[in-house]
């Protein structure tokens, strides 16, 4: 995957972030969880679940592949244990902590989280990385329909005060940082531009799913600052793998 060298500046009203695979590389931990979950369930194909369920709520995966265990309280308990039992298998997506800290340092709340993980698990991942959680921290416990439904990202953008504005889209420009097909579909359905993080899937796959910018990780992204007059935060992409031509006109 070749990187470009000409920086790209993107000015937006708000940014929404997935967590697993976007802020933290938790897939090895979650894979270990699924393998342990399936040890006493002969009908449960852990490798298949690992392959197809990235970006889903754990409850939705269990409801589909082990419906007898689809109890919300039970699933919440299972997920809360993942960072504790398997946390040593997880690391930050390179540059994620620095980027999140830069967003937290802005004078106005300009970012939110919308994850398919439960509240307990997502909070523990943030504690694991030492990142202060944003005010709007949307988890599996806060939505009726998980990704690929747009509800998580709609809640994030609406909470920050930037609902879809069909009359004047320039006043409600929101980007989603995502790595997974379900989240990309959710973000697009929520009227957002998609910044694809190539941690889980490759460049061609992310292009096929409709990402507007694709980066290897967060190391090449900087927060340029906040303009109170335009109510925009600037993201500067020093390197990127791909960008749609029309993005520069957004």
From Swiss-Prot:
- Give EC number(s), comma-separated: 3.1.3.21
Pfam families reported for this sequence: Hydrolase
* Superkingdom of the source species: Eukaryota
Q: Which residues carry this modification: Phosphoserine?
A: 90
- Residues noted as binding Mg(2+) in the record, renumbered to the chain: 18, 20, 179
Description of what induces expression? By osmotic stress (at protein level).
Covalent cross-link Glycyl lysine isopeptide (Lys-Gly) (interchain with G-Cter in ubiquitin), where: 64, 144
Main subcellular localization, coarse class? cytoplasm
Enumerate the InterPro entries for this protein.
Answer: HAD-like_sf, HAD-like_SPP, HAD-SF_hydro_IA, HAD_sf, PGP-like_dom2
Key words of the record:
Cytoplasm, Hydrolase, Isopeptide bond, Magnesium, Metal-binding, Nucleus, Phosphoprotein, Stress response, Ubl conjugation
* Catalytic residues, chain numbering: 18, 20
Q: Which GO terms describe its molecular function?
A: glycerol-1-phosphatase activity; glycerol-3-phosphatase activity; metal ion binding
Query: Which GO cellular component terms, listed alphabetically, does the Swiss-Prot or TrEMBL entry include?
Result: cytoplasm; nucleus
Record field: catalytic activity: sn-glycerol 1-phosphate + H2O = glycerol + phosphate; sn-glycerol 3-phosphate + H2O = glycerol + phosphate
Cofactor(s) for this protein? Mg(2+)
Influence of pH: Optimum pH is 6.5.
Q: Name one GO biological process term.
A: carbohydrate metabolic process
Subcellular location per the Swiss-Prot or TrEMBL entry: Cytoplasm; Nucleus
Establish whether keyword Metal-binding is in the entry.
yes
On assembly, the entry states: Monomer.
Please describe what this protein does.
Answer: Glycerol-1-phosphate phosphohydrolase involved in glycerol biosynthesis. Plays a role in osmoadaptation.
Any miscellaneous information on file? Present with 5000 molecules/cell in log phase SD medium.
Name the protein family.
Belongs to the HAD-like hydrolase superfamily. DOG/GPP family.
UniProt protein name: Glycerol-1-phosphate phosphohydrolase 2
């Amino acid at each position: 995957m070749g990187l470009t060298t000409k920086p790209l500046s993107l000015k937006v009203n708000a940014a929404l972030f997935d967590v697993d695979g976007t802020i933290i590389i938790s897939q090895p931990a979650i894979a270990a969880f699924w393998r342990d979950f399936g040890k006493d369930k002969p009908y449960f194909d852990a490798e298949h679940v690992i392959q197809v369920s990235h970006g889903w709520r754990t409850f939705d995966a269990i409801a589909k592949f082990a419906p007898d265990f689809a109890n919300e309280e039970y699933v919440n308990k299972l997920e809360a244990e993942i960072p504790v039992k398997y946390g040593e298998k997880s690391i930050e997506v390179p540059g994620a902590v620095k980027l999140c800290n830069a967003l937290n340092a802005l004078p106005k709340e300009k970012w939110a989280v919308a994850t398919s993980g439960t509240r307990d698990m997502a909070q523990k991942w943030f504690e694991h990385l030492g990142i202060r959680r944003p005010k709007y921290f949307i988890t599996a416990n806060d939505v009726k329909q998980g990704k690929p439904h747009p509800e998580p990202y709609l809640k994030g953008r609406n909470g920050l005060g930037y609902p879809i504005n069909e009359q004047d889209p320039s006043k409600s420009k929101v980007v989603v940082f995502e790595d997974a097909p379900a989240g990309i579909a959710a973000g697009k359905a929520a009227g957002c531009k998609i910044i694809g993080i190539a941690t889980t899937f490759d460049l061609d796959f992310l292009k096929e799913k409709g990402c507007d910018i694709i980066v290897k990780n967060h190391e090449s992204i900087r927060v340029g600052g906040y303009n109170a007059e335009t109510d925009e935060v600037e993201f500067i992409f020093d390197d990127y793998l791909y960008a749609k031509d029309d993005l520069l006109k957004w």
